[in-house]
UniProtKB/Swiss-Prot annotation:
This is Small ribosomal subunit protein uS9. It comes from Borrelia hermsii (strain HS1 / DAH). The keyword Ribonucleoprotein applies. The lineage of its organism: Bacteria, Pseudomonadati, Spirochaetota, Spirochaetia, Spirochaetales. Signal peptide: none annotated. One of its GO terms (biological process) is translation. Gene3D superfamilies: 3.30.230.10.
Length: 136
């Protein structure tokens, strides 16, 4: 499934989604450089919790320093973007090397999280909250 570039280095690609965020992850063998929207990973993701969420597929498969990642992400907030990056990295690892499939699938990294924001209904204050009710 993995393609190779001009130099013969294996390439993998994966698209991850979470809430309204979309991440396109390009992965190839390298030193472990991670770029998000042409910025360094640490300058883009500053919260430690979000960093661990985003890099959890690499930690789980013991490939943290073995691949270079180039990520394009848009939409949503920082939490949704971290989840989209996690989903995209997991799919890219699976496309690059299928021996990671069992580990990633058993931990739920290849499954898209279907939860989205519920729409506001008319006659209500928010999606489920009603206006204040007075009996008398």
């Amino acid at each position: 499934m993995a393609k190779s570039d001009v130099k013969g280095i294996n390439l993998g690609m994966g698209t991850g989604r979470r809430k309204s965020s979309v991440a396109r992850v390009y992965i190839r063998e390298g030193k472990g450089d991670i770029k998000i929207n042409s910025r360094d990973f640490d300058s883009y993701m500053q919260l430690e919790k979000l960093k661990t969420i985003a890099l959890s597929p690499l930690v789980l498969t013991n490939t943290l320093g073995k691949y270079d990642l180039y990520i394009n992400i848009y939409g949503g907030g920082i939490s949704g973007q971290a989840g989209a990056i996690r989903h995209g990295i997991a799919r890219a690892l699976f496309n690059l090397d299928e021996e990671h499939k069992m580990i990633l699938k058993s931990n739920g990294f290849l499954t898209r999280d279907p939860r989205k924001v519920e729409r506001k209904k008319f006659g209500k204050k928010k999606a489920r909250k009603s206006f204040q009710f007075s009996k008398r």
